[in-house]
From Swiss-Prot:
Residues 1-28 are annotated as: Disordered. The N-terminal arginine-rich stretch does not seem to be the major RNA-binding region that allows formation of an infectious ribonucleoprotein complex. One of its GO terms (molecular function) is structural molecule activity. It comes from Cucumber mosaic virus (strain CS). Its main location: virion. It is found in: Virion. Belongs to the cucumovirus capsid protein family. This is Capsid protein. Capsid protein. Probably binds RNA and plays a role in packaging. It comes from the Viruses.
Length: 218
């Protein structure tokens, strides 16, 4: 072997990787990467249809109509026995009701389940006579007549079901802020007794902008 061959052989020996410094990807590593990719795709799919737990407003769902803003109120139903009903009239703040002729375009209700929620509830909003005492019998009849959309909200293992909003359009009725006291949010507890620490309802009333309102949400 001449000198050049000896030098080349020595260089090749130096280039040989040290044992244990690198190894081919194992089957377990490959399976882990595939599983990670699948979980990532699944999380993206779920997140696309999963509502947030943040306070729901038209800011979070869609823009207000031009020239409109919204007023939000929160309702926390009391204990409702299994198969029974609860109703609460929409009472807006005085700073809003003094502009009682401003038109209302729609009402949005969002169901926010609390940690202990494990029931099925039906939620709707209805215009009710001023004389109505919102008794169980009266509310039961309103749910049965089919005159208003109803949101059926059920316990979901993820914490919140995909469809947790009810949008009630009033634009064709020419309803105004003064009419809101004639409307009520109604809740039916179907399968179990609903406890006081299981559910919160967020209600957004979209109405024409009033002088005390700020800029429209974006």
């Amino acid at each position: 072997m001449d000198k050049s061959e000896s030098t080349s052989a020595g260089r090749n020996r130096r280039r040989r990787p040290r044992r244990g410094s690198r190894s081919a990807p194992s089957s377990a590593d490959a399976n882990f990467r595939v599983l990670s990719q699948q979980l990532s795709r699944l999380n993206k799919t779920l997140a696309a249809g999963r509502p947030t737990i943040n306070h729901p407003t038209f800011v979070g769902s869609e823009r207000c109509k031009p020239g409109y803003t919204f007023t939000s109120i929160t309702l926390k139903p009391p204990k409702i026995d299994r198969g029974s009903y609860y109703g609460k009239r929409l009472l807006l703040p005085d700073s809003v009701t003094e502009y009682d002729k401003k038109l209302v375009s729609r009402i949005q209700i969002r169901v926010n389940p609390l940690r202990k929620f494990d029931s099925t509830v039906w939620v709707t909003v209805r215009k009710v006579p001023a004389s109505s005492d919102l008794s169980v019998a009266a509310i039961s009849a309103m749910f049965a007549d089919g005159a208003s959309p109803v949101l059926v909200y059920q316990y979901a293992a993820s914490g919140v079901q995909a469809n947790n909003k009810l949008l009630y359009d009033l634009s064709a009725m020419r309803a105004d802020i003064g009419d809101m006291r004639k409307y009520a949010v109604l809740v039916y507890s179907k399968d179990d007794a609903l406890e006081t620490d299981e559910l919160v309802l967020h209600v957004d009333v979209e109405h024409q902008r009033i002088p005390t309102s700020g800029v429209l949400p974006v």
